Amino acid sequence: MRTRVLRCRPFSTRILLLLLFVLAFGVYCYFYNASPQNYNKPRISYPASMEHFKSSLTHTVKSRDEPTPDQCPALKESEADIDTVAIYPTFDFQPSWLRTKEFWDKSFEDRYERIHNDTTRPRLKVIVVPHSHNDPGWLKTFEQYFEWKTKNIINNIVNKLHQYPNMTFIWTEISFLNAWWERSHPVKQKALKKLIKEGRLEITTGGWVMPDEACTHIYALIDQFIEGHHWVKTNLGVIPKTGWSIDPFGHGATVPYLLDQSGLEGTIIQRIHYAWKQWLAERQIEEFYWLASWATTKPSMIVHNQPFDIYSIKSTCGPHPSICLSFDFRKIPGEYSEYTAKHEDITEHNLHSKAKTLIEEYDRIGSLTPHNVVLVPLGDDFRYEYSVEFDAQYVNYMKMFNYINAHKEIFNADVQFGTPLDYFNAMKERHQNIPSLKGDFFVYSDIFSEGKPAYWSGYYTTRPYQKILARQFEHQLRSAEILFTLVSNYIRQMGRQGEFGASEKKLEKSYEQLIYARRNLGLFQHHDAITGTSKSSVMQDYGTKLFTSLYHCIRLQEAALTTIMLPDQSLHSQSIIQSEVEWETYGKPPKKLQVSFIDKKKVILFNPLAETRTEVVTVRSNTSNIRVYDTHKRKHVLYQIMPSITIQDNGKSIVSDTTFDIMFVATIPPLTSISYKLQEHTNTSHHCVIFCNNCEQYQKSNVFQIKKMMPGDIQLENAVLKLLVNRNTGFLRQVYRKDIRKRTVVDVQFGAYQSAQRHSGAYLFMPHYDSPEKNVLHPYTNQNNMQDDNIIIVSGPISTEITTMYLPFLVHTIRIYNVPDPVLSRAILLETDVDFEAPPKNRETELFMRLQTDIQNGDIPEFYTDQNGFQYQKRVKVNKLGIEANYYPITTMACLQDEETRLTLLTNHAQGAAAYEPGRLEVMLDRRTLYDDFRGIGEGVVDNKPTTFQNWILIESMPGVTRAKRDTSEPGFKFVNERRFGPGQKESPYQVPSQTADYLSRMFNYPVNVYLVDTSEVGEIEVKPYQSFLQSFPPGIHLVTLRTITDDVLELFPSNESYMVLHRPGYSCAVGEKPVAKSPKFSSKTRFNGLNIQNITAVSLTGLKSLRPLTGLSDIHLNAMEVKTYKIRF
């Protein structure tokens, strides 16, 4: 459907302009026609401003300075001893040992015998680490687990370590430790601190939880590490030195980077692909330095991989689970399991044989290392909740340890209880030649359930409603953090002059809710929360916590903006500035509040990013006679009036005459709030035109033109893009870029894999290979397979969109913007509403959105995914494996590319993505599996909620393409794909997004915050037109957060100190449009407006270690991709 913009000038110029336009239009259609021949193309015209017409048609971009190498460095791939991308496809994924579930075969046993008999080899040293893995929610909620298990476990740690001076323990989940601390007697608190000071109880990792590493976003990861580390430092007086990450389902490079930046010396990982376990064991590699994928300084933190399947005693004492089971001495009355069946206490009669068997298993682990130091976890999920287990494990193991250590002539070993820090210290004394590794360990696969490979790629997508809610909450928390820090310190400093006393107290009171919000976000980063892999009732509890804290964050934002935007302080105690979105209840989509000329005719926008942005904002109104006025620039802005359309049960569309969406364009400086006024005004040129074949015949809209759609395929068009839409489906078919006259096939499809029953569930993804892909839309399609009656097109001065409906299952919208912005005009927004309906409908359905393109990304397809919104990873299809093993996690984007074109798909939540066939990119949207996949939760996933998915598509030129080339291969296309190659340029080996994609991703994840000014109780009031909190901040730097530090003495009160966490994103200046010069340098002019900084210090990522004092913000420097933290005292 073509859109054209036209406005009549006064009579003297109107006819001339009209003739010129018709002539230009005819020439344009002849040369740049992008539609198939011999079909009747609909033409649409509607009035708009001439300024918009010019900018939209020509879309000239202001001249920009060329970026310097410092502003846009060409990043290089790091060089490592182990490259996971190169090595992984070479594995034998069906080795002969799968049926035994143990890779330990004769070759390993023979090597063990040789090493055991080598008299020059260092003596075996074994560090046994008692632990209890406490999930902060899984089969039960956080609170239920704490009351049922965890508080008893921590009490037993305190009591039994005092009783047994040789025993040690570790603790990782600070969320649980905080709950215990708040309820424990000071005597117990002191006893616990004493154990930590003695080094017998080690706090490992120190995060609020043990986070998932596939679905988490960098903001939430950093935030929960800061929250946990500060709790540890404040309450226990220590700084974590080692990490313990034994249960996340696969491991990526981001968490090791963050831990290294936080000052940890070593970390331990567990769950990686069974083939990686074998490969590393064969090469005696248990430790490595995990490099970032881009060339940067070598990390100082060492990563240790546990060599066997899982962290339970059955799998940790050595390569033979049947032997290890007999060394689990837990025996609780009424408990019967595989380990109780083999239970046998150590006595003087079996001491020698048991000690010999145990040390042989330990020695076998030692043969997998060059240094002969062995770390052996001793525990399992929620272990040691009974004091008798402490007694049994300690007494039996100490008998064997004492016997082994007393008979070195027989065993040649030292065995002791210890901690991970003890292990790393002992290992480093013997081993310095540690290899480096780059890449990651996704997809995780196990074989210990059935002796068959099972791929844990389902959880990348499971329960998308909660994944989306979590990201929305991140955005609201981040905005609340920044506003609280800026406004509270502003009024504190102004308060010295006697102002803002009441406002300061109100904000201080809200700080407690900010702490709870941080902790609820941190809790959801747990590897059974954001993954969607807890029981349905537990997921409901997580969601309710997120929803509650999201509500409080929005209220805090409103209070902060009320203080700063309303000059009349007597109004600060009232709820006048209100979010334009109402979150009524968990599980339901948010609603927009209506603006009104009676009491809500002012809108405030806050840009939470530290960079200027142009955004299209939509507010709801009860009138269409309206226009938008920027009170700061004192001018009217570009806007359009859109209909509110209701779909009836019979599929008929009702266009409302009482509810309207006002869409306008706003350009907002960094960390700035601007007020807009909605003025009564009648101008139908700003009203959208509706094309609809199935709108009620009797309905005659008094506001909008409603027209029938014309025959033929549908085109959406702005000044830069021309989209061809398949009329039979309503989905995108191809994209034509006018600036380089190039067509790209982008065929959007929706389908589903049928789940393999009992092999696909919350964790696992396994399609039923004997069943074809499911045509999920067929039951919701018209009998004639034509979508005409289910398509609505809405076209206006700012946007054009097409919506196609397969009710009630799926509603899909394609939107492009016709605004003078180089980013928004080049991007395509896809919005998909999915409702699985109540089970058993759509059972065993793994729903995907697929983009089939003509991009030549290799016969063995390659694509790129982000990792945690921080870095980027190349993915190569492994032909030996099925689709389930070729799905990878994304959190912000994925892209396909060849020598000429890159397609980037942006997302605002975690989901799985694959490029299983050449030119194809698909993302999983939602999953419903009726059956459990036998990985612990004991139920399927049937609690699907109606969910709205949003994605942006960017299609960009790769380096070397400078202009179009004639291509007559497609009928109707003229002068397409013409190009010429410029001088040879060295491309950046490390693939990063374009500057446009990087910027659009941040806009997508951190949208403008919109508020209404409610004057229903106070009448007309003064609202400041503009409030900027930042000046001369370098646009090449992303402000991750500006987070107030809690007072050292008053636990729930804020201090005047904050952490400013910064990230310098890496992006390519060679891909896509000519980049804007974005300086990463801070200057003497960089400041927070209205705030005095007493001092600033460079600190470790979580702030526990001071690195160096700075003279001011101008001393800050970040290299590309780096994340750094600075402590600011206001």
Curated annotation (Swiss-Prot):
Side Cytoplasmic, residues: 1-14
Entry GO terms, CC: endoplasmic reticulum; Golgi membrane
Modification after translation (UniProt): N-glycosylated.
SUPFAM superfamilies from the UniProt entry: Families 57/38 glycoside transferase middle domain, Galactose mutarotase-like, Glycoside hydrolase/deacetylase
Protein's membrane topology: Single-pass type II membrane protein
Binding sites annotated in the UniProt record for Zn(2+): H133, D135, D247, H527
Role: Catalyzes the first committed step in the biosynthesis of complex N-glycans. It controls conversion of high mannose to complex N-glycans; the final hydrolytic step in the N-glycan maturation pathway.
Official protein name in the record: Alpha-mannosidase 2
Cofactor(s) demanded: Zn(2+)
Keyword set, alphabetical order: Disulfide bond, Endoplasmic reticulum, Glycoprotein, Glycosidase, Golgi apparatus, Hydrolase, Membrane, Metal-binding, Microsome, Signal-anchor, Transmembrane, Transmembrane helix, Zinc
Species this protein is from: Spodoptera frugiperda
Subunit and partners: Homodimer; disulfide-linked.
Reaction catalysis annotation: N(4)-{beta-D-GlcNAc-(1->2)-alpha-D-Man-(1->3)-[alpha-D-Man-(1->3)-[alpha-D-Man-(1->6)]-alpha-D-Man-(1->6)]-beta-D-Man-(1->4)-beta-D-GlcNAc-(1->4)-beta-D-GlcNAc}-L-asparaginyl-[protein] + 2 H2O = 2 alpha-D-mannopyranose + an N(4)-{beta-D-GlcNAc-(1->2)-alpha-D-Man-(1->3)-[alpha-D-Man-(1->6)]-beta-D-Man-(1->4)-beta-D-GlcNAc-(1->4)-beta-D-GlcNAc}-L-asparaginyl-[protein]
Class of enzymatic activity (EC top level): hydrolase
Compartments (UniProt record): Microsome membrane; Golgi apparatus membrane
Gene3D superfamilies in UniProt: Glycoside hydrolase 38, N terminal domain, Glycoside hydrolase family 38, central domain, Golgi alpha-mannosidase II, Golgi alpha-mannosidase II, domain 4
Spans through the membrane: 15-35
Gene Ontology annotations of biological process type: mannose metabolic process; N-glycan processing; protein glycosylation
Glycosylation sites per record: N117, N166, N622, N683, N1056, N1095
